[in-house]
Amino acid sequence: MKNIICFFTFFFLFGSLRSEAGQLIEYNLQGAMTQDDIIYILWIAGIDPQADYGVSIYDIKYETEGEGGYLDTLGGLVIFPHSLTEAFPILSYQHGTAVNDASAPSLTGLSLDNQEVLLISLITSPMGFITLFPDYEGFGDPEKFHPYITAESYSHAIVNMVRAVKELSYELQLDDPFQFNDQLHLLGYSEGGYATLAAQRGIELNYNDEFTITTSCPMAGPYDLGGTMVDYFLSIPSYPKPFYVPFVLTSHLWYYQGEDVDFSLYFKPFWADTLPSLFDGTHYGNEIDALMPENPLDILLPEALDDFTNNEDHFFRVSLGENTLLDWTPQSPTYFFHGMGDDIVPYENAQVTYDTFVANGAPNISLTLFSEELGGHAEVAPTCLSAGYNVILDYQAISPKGDLNSDGLITIEDVNALMESILIENDLTEFQWWAGDLDADNSHSIFDLLGVSDAVAN
């Protein structure tokens, strides 16, 4: 295994050194696969074996915004296709709920220990996507907690991983080159569905001058956390995956009140003592479920449950409300998918969110609900993921040299864009500089313009 550790620093005033959010800290080559390797694995898995490209697999570490304004180091996995002459869309895939740190994508890589990552990777990257798997804040790090279902943490993790992968492209240009274009796709299911919509919200509200989202496909996420999800838990006598509830509640307590928060103010004595160790990253969800009561709210003190039920200003009501994702209007193409038989995350989350966005004037939004006959949360996941991926394929553009506008074609529009670059030195993205530099001399010149013009003529 080839291990490469890179420390990238920037000089500021007075000669000081400083990192910044999105900076690539470390990268490690986990391996590579040929087209034949991928086709064989997909065939064994019973999946239609298609692979247009071989791929490389790297885990990375990068900086993101952390608590108190300090930087935090996160991990992730990136798989990219092999081509010296094409630029590919970035597809950020947000994984579903996991509790044990050993399940982080950067740690499992492409292995049977993480079949979600393995299958999504081998379906997407060999077909021309640079596929990213953010670990998420705190996940995979035994020294930290993962702030489960907190919107801002996902937004930061995903934005900064995209930045870091773009830096990785620069760092690998001699050893293992790959090139991104200007397309960015978001896709995720369950926790990943929530993370997808949270990242879309964060990008559109705070980073729209840096990123344009091509498509966003949130699936089966608890977007209406303070409404649909609260009503659901207060109305049901039991819940199939009870560990989800304390995972949210402990995460919100630690995230907003600090890791020294007094759990005995909220939970019955046994749970106040036990929950911190259950969510220390060494246990699996099924282990925690085996300890939980059928009704997960039974872990709360009676007075805390009563206050939560009747007081809109209760801490949990406020934190859940702050992380409800209905307070904006998506501008990017947004495609919701959910199963009507979902027994973990009710489909009303998607319905309420869709209705709210439509009422607010969202220009390009869709909701697909799948029949109860397709099963519950886990059973309907492959159907949702397949539908979302097919939407993304419809938008996908793989860009040859000369395709400055990322539409997968070389047209007169690309000629005009390159001419403007040469004549007036207008601002271009990193991809557009690559696309316009046909003779690879690190500049845009009349020779590049002639090359693009010839491509249009032919």
What are these regions (language model features)?
Residues 67-75, 79-126:
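Short, surface-exposed "cap/lid" segments of acyl-processing enzymes
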Residues 398-458:
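Cellulosome-associated attachment modules in secreted, modular CAZymes
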Residues 19-86:
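Catalytic-loop region of hydrolases
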Residues 335-342:
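Short beta-strand/loop motif that positions the catalytic acidic residue
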